[in-house]
């Protein structure tokens, strides 16, 4: 089937392959200004713990080059700037210009200058040299990518041998009772919060649906192996609501 005839998921809706990127862009242009506030409200602040645990697993050191992909408003990039020091470099990359602008303003106001670059880029075709980064992170962004396999292969290409990729993403709860509560919260509370805070219930309806369409823990693990990563492992967080996958390039 040619790409012109292919379809893919946008939440629970099937859309033409080339249309998903535009629709996802619309979501994040809409929510960028209130993105951080909504993250705190939706997760009761727990997203900060998930990200802190992710950063602790990166192994980032002084002088490293780090790519924070789909980095949005820069929660991880800010910490990486401190970790790599003046001799290192952090690239905060996002496909969405609104998110990137919010991230740049936020990090500049926090004094993160000199060792950070901002690059608008598509994860499926990263504009960086082969074997360039010591570490790549993508936090709550992979599920929005149209061609996830292509994006993972692109990440593998730009990662140095010996480097690691960390994928922090919503996943499949492993506790049945938690799964039921989570479904109720996702499909009812999230759109309601979105309507009250951002005047955009539909974007948060998409959020809940996109989580359900994202590959589960074992499927994503295999996708990372298929993309060229080795020693792939994952850690469930908060009962599997979120999972952190780590893969290495040798």
UniProtKB/Swiss-Prot annotation:
One GO biological process term is: menaquinone biosynthetic process
Which pathway does it serve? Quinol/quinone metabolism; menaquinone biosynthesis; menaquinol from 1,4-dihydroxy-2-naphthoate: step 2/2; Cofactor biosynthesis; ubiquinone biosynthesis
The reaction(s) catalysed by this protein are: a 2-demethylmenaquinol + S-adenosyl-L-methionine = a menaquinol + S-adenosyl-L-homocysteine + H(+); a 2-methoxy-6-(all-trans-polyprenyl)benzene-1,4-diol + S-adenosyl-L-methionine = a 5-methoxy-2-methyl-3-(all-trans-polyprenyl)benzene-1,4-diol + S-adenosyl-L-homocysteine + H(+)
Cystine crosslinks: none
Single GO molecular-function term? 2-methoxy-6-polyprenyl-1,4-benzoquinol methyltransferase activity
Keywords of the record, alphabetical order, are: Menaquinone biosynthesis, Methyltransferase, S-adenosyl-L-methionine, Transferase, Ubiquinone biosynthesis
E.C. numbers: 2.1.1.163, 2.1.1.201
Write out the residues that bind S-adenosyl-L-methionine: 73, 94, 122-123, 139
The job of this chain, per UniProt, is described as: Methyltransferase required for the conversion of demethylmenaquinol (DMKH2) to menaquinol (MKH2) and the conversion of 2-polyprenyl-6-methoxy-1,4-benzoquinol (DDMQH2) to 2-polyprenyl-3-methyl-6-methoxy-1,4-benzoquinol (DMQH2).
The family note in this entry says: Belongs to the class I-like SAM-binding methyltransferase superfamily. MenG/UbiE family.
| Record-given protein name | Ubiquinone/menaquinone biosynthesis C-methyltransferase UbiE
Query: Which species does this protein come from?
Result: Francisella philomiragia subsp. philomiragia (strain ATCC 25017 / CCUG 19701 / FSC 153 / O#319-036)
Tell me the organism's taxonomic lineage: Bacteria, Pseudomonadati, Pseudomonadota, Gammaproteobacteria, Thiotrichales
């Amino acid at each position: 089937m040619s790409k012109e005839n292919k379809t893919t998921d946008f939440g629970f809706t099937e859309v033409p392959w080339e249309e998903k990127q535009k629709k996802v862009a619309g979501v994040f242009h809409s929510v960028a200004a209130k993105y951080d506030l909504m993250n705190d409200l939706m997760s009761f602040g727990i997203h900060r713990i998930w990200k802190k645990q992710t950063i602790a697993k990166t192994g980032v050191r002084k002088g490293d080059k780090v790519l924070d992909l789909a980095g949005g408003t820069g929660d991880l990039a800010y910490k990486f700037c401190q970790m790599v020091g003046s001799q290192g470099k952090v690239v905060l990359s996002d496909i969405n210009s609104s998110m990137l602008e919010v991230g740049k303003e936020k990090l500049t106001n926090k004094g993160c200058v000199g060792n950070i670059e901002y690059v608008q880029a598509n994860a499926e075709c990263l504009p960086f040299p082969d074997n360039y980064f010591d570490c790549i992170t993508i936090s709550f962004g992979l599920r929005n990518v149209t061609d996830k396999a292509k994006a993972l292969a692109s990440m593998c290409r730009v990662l140095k041998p010996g480097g690691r990729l960390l994928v922090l993403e919503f996943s499949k709860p492993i506790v049945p009772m938690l799964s039921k509560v989570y479904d109720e919260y996702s499909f009812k509370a999230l759109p309601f919060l979105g309507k009250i805070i951002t005047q955009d219930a539909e974007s948060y309806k998409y959020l809940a649906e996109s989580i359900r369409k994202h590959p589960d823990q074992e499927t994503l693990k295999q996708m990372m192996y298929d993309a060229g990563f080795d020693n792939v492992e994952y850690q469930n967080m908060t009962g599997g609501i979120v999972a952190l996958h780590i893969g290495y390039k040798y």
